[in-house]
C-alpha cells in the first residue's frame, strides 16, 4: 500500500512524524479517511480518535480537535492536545470531567458554556480511549 508523510504537531512537541498508509479522523461533517494521493484539503477536525495505519497495523490516539491539511502527499495536523492511550492520566481525566459537569449545571454565558462543554467532550474522549485500550478494542 502506498504511503504518505504524516506530521501531528502540538504547541510543545511533535506528537508523530512518519510515513503511514492511512489515517482516519473526525472532521466537522463526519469521519474522513486519508490515503496517499488524496486531494489537497484544509479542514477543521473535531474531538475524537486519530487512527493511524502503519505497517498494516492500526494505532489510535485521543485528539482534542484541530486543523488538518493535505497537500502534495503530506498531511499535517495541528492540535492543542493529542495523546496515546497509555499517556492519559485517568484520574486527571475524571477530575476534568467532574469539573466540567459541575460548571455546566450553572447558568453560564454562551462562550463559557461552550468552553466547558468542549472540556467535557475532551475528558469523555480521553476516558473512552483508556477503556477501549483496557478492553482491547
Swiss-Prot record:
| One GO molecular-function entry | proton-transporting ATP synthase activity, rotational mechanism
Subunit (UniProt): F-type ATPases have 2 components, CF(1) - the catalytic core - and CF(0) - the membrane proton channel. CF(1) has five subunits: alpha(3), beta(3), gamma(1), delta(1), epsilon(1). CF(0) has three main subunits: a, b and c.
Query: Topology in the membrane?
Result: Peripheral membrane protein
Known SUPFAM superfamilies for this protein? Epsilon subunit of F1F0-ATP synthase C-terminal domain, Epsilon subunit of F1F0-ATP synthase N-terminal domain
Q: Which Pfam families match?
A: ATP-synt_DE, ATP-synt_DE_N
Location of the protein in the cell? Cell membrane
Its biological purpose: Produces ATP from ADP in the presence of a proton gradient across the membrane.
Q: Does the keyword Ion transport apply?
A: yes
**InterPro entries assigned to the protein according to its UniProt record, in alphabetical order:** ATP_F1_dsu/esu_C_sf, ATP_synth_F1_dsu/esu, ATP_synth_F1_dsu/esu_N, ATP_synth_F1_esu_C, ATPsynth_dsu/esu_N
Entry annotated with the keyword Chaperone? no
Gene, per the UniProt record: atpC
Q: To which species is this protein native?
A: Caldicellulosiruptor saccharolyticus (strain ATCC 43494 / DSM 8903 / Tp8T 6331)
Q: Which CDD domains match?
A: F1-ATPase_delta
* Family in the record: Belongs to the ATPase epsilon chain family.
Keywords from the named record: ATP synthesis, Cell membrane, CF(1), Hydrogen ion transport, Ion transport, Membrane, Transport
Its Gene Ontology cellular component terms are: plasma membrane; proton-transporting ATP synthase complex
Name of the protein in its database record: ATP synthase epsilon chain
Amino acid at each position: 500500500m502506498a504511503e504518505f508523510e504524516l506530521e501531528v504537531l502540538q504547541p510543545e512537541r511533535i506528537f508523530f512524524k512518519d510515513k503511514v498508509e492511512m489515517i482516519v479522523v473526525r472532521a466537522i461533517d463526519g469521519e474522513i479517511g486519508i490515503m496517499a494521493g488524496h486531494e489537497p484539503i484544509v479542514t477543521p477536525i473535531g474531538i475524537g480518535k486519530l487512527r493511524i495505519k502503519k505497517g498494516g497495523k492500526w494505532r489510535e490516539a485521543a485528539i482534542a480537535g484541530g486543523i488538518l491539511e493535505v497537500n502534495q502527499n503530506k498531511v499535517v495536523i495541528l492540535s492543542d492536545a493529542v495523546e496515546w492511550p497509555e499517556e492519559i492520566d485517568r484520574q486527571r481525566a475524571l477530575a476534568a470531567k467532574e469539573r466540567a459537569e459541575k460548571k455546566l449545571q450553572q447558568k453560564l454565558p454562551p462562550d463559557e458554556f461552550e468552553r466547558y462543554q468542549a472540556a467535557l467532550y475532551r475528558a469523555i474522549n480521553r476516558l473512552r480511549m483508556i477503556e477501549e485500550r483496557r478492553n482491547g478494542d
